[in-house]
Amino acid sequence: PCIYQNALIYDYILNADNPNSQIIKYLVNRGAKFEVHDEGYSGRTPMHFWARRNNYQLLELAIKGGANVDMQTFSKLRKCNNETLLFEAVSEPETYRVTQLLIELGANVNFATPTTPLDDAKGSRNKKLLKDAGAMTSEQIRKKFNLPAYDSSHCEIDGKTDMDLLGKYHDEYSKLLNDAIKKAKESE
């Protein structure tokens, strides 16, 4: 059984127009990390929904209580992690407060999927916050570390994209970018 769909508290968190912060605080105090992913295509956690809905108060409670500021979605289909909370935050121009909070709490502004939050950012405030925090586009990362260009043309078979092959290439290229960033940080 899916713990996510069967847990009433997660149903409440996702469906309440304005989740009660006292309930979230109670859960945090009891060790909740909110690392339960939905079983749908997106694989989001409650925190991803809060980021998209601009609910920075609940995100702050959860992260300061021990939840991962770089929590990723989990694709059940590809069995891999993907976008962090920051991707959700920058997907809407009006969620700049969430973007600012995540950056202040240490979110990785250059996490690549292979796109980065700066590649996907909507709204001038989100873009400025990211740039001020040292964010780069995936193309800037590629050039800075002299990495090969993203080319998924080999993922086509008989004129159609093989989604499994594309997914694997996508993941490998993301890892290449993320490893380059990690290595650069370690040598600082």
Model-flagged regions — what are they?
Residues 96, 109-111:
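Substrate-binding/catalytic groove segments of enzymes
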